[in-house]
Regions:
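Catalytic NTP-binding/metal-coordinating core of nucleotidyl cyclase/transferase enzymes
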Residues: 4-87, 91-92
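Acidic, Ala/Val/Gly-enriched low-complexity intrinsically disordered segments
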Residues: 194-196
Length: 196
């Protein structure tokens, strides 16, 4: 009986695919309110922004795992690539907002974390994902909030400045958070070969 239990536990562990990954979470600020005001225009604007994000994911190695409403969850193998992608996205959204009507403008929050995740089909689970979502909730509109694990890998590979927000309590969990200070898109560099 005990042997069967051990075999069952081993089988269950083998079915679970775990790895360290960089998690990218974003959503639209005030999406529900915008939908109440003008559903069609809000959806058109969101799709336009989503096309921008999809192209950036393709360029920087992001893999989309889940989308729900205005939220997007993606995974990167490189912390540097994820930060580059996030910054470029915010830059392009800022430029887009200058060229469209006020009701068509959109603002995004982004959270980035590197941690342990569980992969099951097209879904990601685990503490690594939860922390990224909490960081996204901490982010300012048009901002990017990242974990200490991201900063440790990215800090010496770019010229970005990070504001240390210290330990932030979100949903009964403390997260050491940073936000990107005065995002400098022109100075952001991506090494020719990068790893997490």
């Amino acid at each position: 009986m005990a042997e069967n239990v051990v075999q069952l536990n081993k089988s269950s562990q083998q079915d679970i695919d775990r790895k360290i990954a960089v998690i990218f979470v974003t959503d639209v600020v005030g999406f529900s309110k915008s939908m109440e005001v003008n559903e069609e225009e809000t959806l058109r604007s969101f799709r336009a922004c989503q096309e921008i994000l999809d192209k950036l994911f393709e360029e920087h190695g992001g893999r989309i795992f889940n989308t729900a409403g205005d939220s997007v969850l993606a995974e990167f193998q490189s912390a540097v690539s994820a930060v580059v992608c996030a910054n470029e996205f915010q830059k392009l959204i800022k430029e887009r907002n200058k060229s469209v009507s006020e009701e068509s403008q959109m603002s995004f929050r982004i959270g980035l974390n590197m941690g342990d995740v569980i992969i099951e089909g097209d879904n990601l689970y685990g503490e690594g994902v939860n922390v990224a979502a909490r960081l996204e909730a901490l982010s300012q509109a048009n901002g990017i909030c990242v974990s200490k694990s991201i900063v440790d890998f990215v800090n010496k590979k770019t010229e970005l400045l990070f504001n240390d927000l210290g330990e932030q309590k979100v949903k009964n969990t403390e997260v050491h958070a940073y936000d990107i200070a005065a995002v400098s898109y022109t100075h952001l560099t991506l090494p020719t070969s990068v790893t997490v």
